A protein has these predicted regions:
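Phosphate/oxyanion-binding loops and surfaces in catalytic or ligand/nucleic-acid-binding neighborhoods
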Residues: 27-32, 57, 94-101, 124, ...
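Helix-loop "lid/cap" segments that line or gate small-molecule binding pockets
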Residues: 25-32, 40-44, 116-126
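Hydrophobic/aromatic residues within well-ordered alpha-helical segments
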Residues: 1, 24-28, 58-62, 66, ...
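Hydrophobic alpha-helical connector segments
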Residues: 3-38, 88-91
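Short, flexible helix-adjacent loops and helix caps
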Residues: 6-13, 37-43, 75, 100-107
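C-terminal peripheral helix-coil segments that are non-catalytic and often amphipathic
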Residues: 64, 68-71, 107-154
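Short secondary-structure transition hinges
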Residues: 33-78
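Hydrophobic alpha-helical bundle segments that form small-molecule/ligand-binding pockets
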Residues: 62-95, 99-106
């Protein structure tokens, strides 16, 4: 069966690589906003075994799909990087683990800085797919999901 990521990619196959990655990030936010990261998921993210398994899935499965999309972006001229595989792996690890307050506890200011750094990093290596709007939506979603754990109101 197709993964959710594969389905999203097939729905956006007429777009440039950059547009595809941006669309996937937006769809992922919409999906999470609707029903993702409930109490069960939040609890799991505190389990070292679950986090390791999640990181391995990011690198061993999801990164290949993202890398292929980056390669497409290189071919169509919308993205420029010499390291599509490594870029995909690092992006997924930082976005899904380092920027997840359930894994690495932080306040809203620190999370905002992490997201801005990730945006800067991706832009500096030629994969400028994190718009300011996307960052704000991500921050808003994470604040909504993790209000208690993260102590955003401090």
């Amino acid at each position: 069966t197709k993964s959710m990521l594969e389905s999203w990619l097939s729905e956006t196959d007429t777009l440039t690589g950059k547009e595809q990655l941006t669309a996937i990030l937006e769809k992922n936010l919409d999906c999470q906003d609707a029903h993702y990261l409930d109490e069960v998921m939040s609890g799991r993210m505190k389990s070292a075994e679950f986090v390791l398994s999640y990181m391995q899935t990011c690198v061993n499965q999801d990164a290949a799909l993202i890398s292929n999309t980056i390669q497409q972006g290189i071919t169509d001229g919308s993205l420029v990087t010499d390291f599509p595989d490594e870029c995909a792996e690092v992006f997924l690890l930082l976005m899904n683990v380092w920027c997840d307050p359930a894994v690495f506890r932080c306040d809203a200011r620190k999370l905002s800085l992490r997201l801005r750094f990730l945006q800067h990093l991706m832009k500096s290596i030629g994969v400028d797919v994190l718009s300011d709007t996307l960052l704000e939506r991500t921050l808003d979603l994470l604040q909504k999901l993790y209000t208690e754990e993260v102590h955003f109101n401090e």
